[in-house]
From Swiss-Prot:
The modification N-acetylalanine is found at residue 2. ATP binds at residues 428-434, 454, 500-502. Interacts (via first Pro-rich region) with CAS family members (via SH3 domain), including BCAR1, BCAR3, and CASS4. Interacts with NEDD9 (via SH3 domain). Interacts with GIT1. Interacts with SORBS1. Interacts with ARHGEF28. Interacts with SHB. Part of a complex composed of THSD1, PTK2/FAK1, TLN1 and VCL. Interacts with PXN and TLN1. Interacts with STAT1. Interacts with DCC. Interacts with WASL. Interacts with ARHGEF7. Interacts with GRB2 and GRB7. Component of a complex that contains at least FER, CTTN and PTK2/FAK1. Interacts with BMX. Interacts with TGFB1I1. Interacts with STEAP4. Changing residue 397 to F: Abolishes autophosphorylation. Abolishes interaction with SRC and activation of BMX. Reduces phosphorylation of NEDD9. Residues 35-355 form the FERM domain. It is linked to Aberrant PTK2/FAK1 expression may play a role in cancer cell proliferation, migration and invasion, in tumor formation and metastasis. PTK2/FAK1 overexpression is seen in many types of cancer. Keywords: Acetylation, Angiogenesis, ATP-binding, Cell junction, Cell membrane, Cell projection, Cytoplasm, Cytoskeleton, Developmental protein, Isopeptide bond, Kinase, Membrane, Nucleotide-binding, Nucleus, Phosphoprotein, Transferase, Tyrosine-protein kinase, Ubl conjugation. The Pro-rich regions interact with the SH3 domain of CAS family members, such as BCAR1 and NEDD9, and with the GTPase activating protein ARHGAP26. It is found in: Cell junction, Focal adhesion; Cell membrane; Cytoplasm, Perinuclear region; Cytoplasm, Cell cortex. This is Focal adhesion kinase 1.
Amino acid sequence: MAAAYLDPNLNHTPNSSTKTHLGTGMERSPGAMERVLKVFHYFESNSEPTTWASIIRHGDATDVRGIIQKIVDSHKVKHVACYGFRLSHLRSEEVHWLHVDMGVSSVREKYELAHPPEEWKYELRIRYLPKGFLNQFTEDKPTLNFFYQQVKSDYMLEIADQVDQEIALKLGCLEIRRSYWEMRGNALEKKSNYEVLEKDVGLKRFFPKSLLDSVKAKTLRKLIQQTFRQFANLNREESILKFFEILSPVYRFDKECFKCALGSSWIISVELAIGPEEGISYLTDKGCNPTHLADFTQVQTIQYSNSEDKDRKGMLQLKIAGAPEPLTVTAPSLTIAENMADLIDGYCRLVNGTSQSFIIRPQKEGERALPSIPKLANSEKQGMRTHAVSVSETDDYAEIIDEEDTYTMPSTRDYEIQRERIELGRCIGEGQFGDVHQGIYMSPENPALAVAIKTCKNCTSDSVREKFLQEALTMRQFDHPHIVKLIGVITENPVWIIMELCTLGELRSFLQVRKYSLDLASLILYAYQLSTALAYLESKRFVHRDIAARNVLVSSNDCVKLGDFGLSRYMEDSTYYKASKGKLPIKWMAPESINFRRFTSASDVWMFGVCMWEILMHGVKPFQGVKNNDVIGRIENGERLPMPPNCPPTLYSLMTKCWAYDPSRRPRFTELKAQLSTILEEEKAQQEERMRMESRRQATVSWDSGGSDEAPPKPSRPGYPSPRSSEGFYPSPQHMVQTNHYQVSGYPGSHGITAMAGSIYPGQASLLDQTDSWNHRPQEIAMWQPNVEDSTVLDLRGIGQVLPTHLMEERLIRQQQEMEEDQRWLEKEERFLKPDVRLSRGSIDREDGSLQGPIGNQHIYQPVGKPDPAAPPKKPPRPGAPGHLGSLASLSSPADSYNEGVKLQPQEISPPPTANLDRSNDKVYENVTGLVKAVIEMSSKIQPAPPEEYVPMVKEVGLALRTLLATVDETIPLLPASTHREIEMAQKLLNSDLGELINKMKLAQQYVMTSLQQEYKKQMLTAAHALAVDAKNLLDVIDQARLKMLGQTRPH
């Protein structure tokens, strides 16, 4: 089955639906054939039923099975084998049922020659029904609803105007009951409800035109009300089953009938009936009982062709088990014979539980038959490669495997070696089928050659042994400096594969251990070397299928080699695929590989892009924290891995090209090799330039120091960048928040302040963590190196005599921290001397929903009373010193659960103290407290809650707010008139806050299962906390009004 792609950006919507029946087939632009297919189906959506469709992108090798699979997968259908694909001509009654093995491109070429593409309509339909299909479909709700919509549509189009009035009324009322199942049984008794159904929805959606035209409006209304009451207690599923029960006597939707003739020479005109209950039967007269011909389990082969007479009728031949001669059916045309053959073949596949077709197609003139596959002895299998290909291989890998000379054999020498020449050493790794050991091979050329030895755990059976040796059979094809070389095999039990030893182990572990010592040029070098190996494989027309850092071995510090060629053979075994689903590298695989098990050179390009990302991330695995089942959803929603720190924009742009959803838009390995070579040369040139600048600075420092023992000056203030470039690039939190990873234009400059802030302040590091879905720890960020300004003289010699270099750096960092804290203290002093210290709305502006002060991400709001002008606030304590950090008990931010790694603990936040009033019977105070509690409860539950639970939680907050506002309305008349305006403004602000919370909730539901879901959850928390804070402000306003009223009533 070839790959097809459901394009989320092209989904059909009501606004873009066609007004006529034209434009429903293949779309194409002038001069080029667009690989886009519009497929109509009966999966319900919010639009009109006539516009239910999916837009599918497909490749040249896509077959009909791939199109069907893609659509039904998105609806979680169980009975996939029941679905068929129909092509209809809109200007005639021409209908073609497309077999699942037909290629979509060949279908277009064939039928668009006869009619323009806009005159064709592609439909997904349920055609093949199992016995007792309704009972089976009740366990598969998407299929049951699909079949109901299909049958209802056929009924309305074909026979609705001919059925009895009572049946039409019942069927129409059952559809009303199903559509509005929450509606009470007597709801249509009310005139307003009936008018909504009649005018807004339209009765023609439920009843045939003949009934609406023949019955007066008042009479029809009474008939509908009476009939609807009969089904008042049915739920949706019961309404569907009742619909089928009433319709089946007048319309046999469970079988298809064809007017044809039995025999070829002496023929009998009959009506052939094909269905799950009858099997293959025929009727000679309408009133007679059907005569059974055969069951689907008896059909062995199906053939069809044109008859040899002048009428060119279609001939269908069925080879039936136990019958002396084939059953011959003469159809009016070859098209009808093809449609009958597809129907019988679909039923045969369904009842036999196989995807193998029973149709034998005649060999066309000019086609050559495939050669027979020779059966080789074991000794022959060891010495040579056979081109025997299983059926599953030809289906999945038609673009890769060829009957011609696919591989160039490097040599014909025998790879079998003697076991006594191998000295088995310690185990250095564990594989899927066995362990890997270090060893010594005593060859004639080298008596002590270090080798790696793969052993097989369970190689007693021939099948396991052959699968294990397949990797050796594959590796012997290649001779490349960056591909692990095969040295030999031992085919006798226990089976061993001997390969060259890469002493530094697998690349992923190597990157993790050496991440602080490897520079960017080395990382790009590894990617480039892998691209040369994969370009070599591409030239050999070979697909690796498991490109990942764990399968790359490090031969030396400047040489890596691609290994592990075993998965390609194992993936071809469908039984192994199903049994070992968890072992598939889902997070590295291309979307067409995940969906259809289709592996091509383009899917290798995708995996290589992920492998490059791993290298740049120093061995971090992709999509950490994401379930395998959720990966394909994120990819199809446009999400890609983020740009790694220190990654050049040109390299990340190249990665994103590797991750194009359409395989045809991905670059080839030859292009990747050339572009990586260019990027590597650029990085080497930049590295040399940095080294020259560094050496000049060192010389300047040594020349200018003059033996001074003065302590080094403090680094420059934040916001005044140093001329010196940082050693690497580390994005700021603002850049890390970007969810569109294709945007590389936000690549910041090379000033050292960004890297410095990321390492000095743990709070900043946590901000990086919380926006990164893959939980990179702040320890991965390199330590800040002190900036040395050109105008500053730093005596390294004098310092070195007193302090070691690392202590000197710690002193510089401590001075930088003190300078930052001094700056914050001055800002706070200036702010606190202002007359209005009321809590600012800026305290809820943080993205993670936690409360903070109005100054910025690092400045937490400090509540104080009126400061004494003679005594400014105390200077804040040094980091690590005991302070009065706390959290607001009533408004603690649960959004911290989004943050992974180091948590940024908010300091205590409290508005100006509440007035000292008697609260014993204060309804406003009680309701404000109730609202705050509702916000806290919602905040504690929102993180793990599914989207359908958002509405009840927000509803509780809304009810608490409504109660509060009603209480305030009762209190306002008792307060001075001069305060009413301020109270009303505070009430409006609360209503606005609730509206904002509802909007954020809708966005969080809309973008569920995407990279934006967490972002909108955070915004929900932010809106909820704003609501709670403004409720407290409303209480303060009312308290001030009460105090004012008390002041006016006091005697003077």
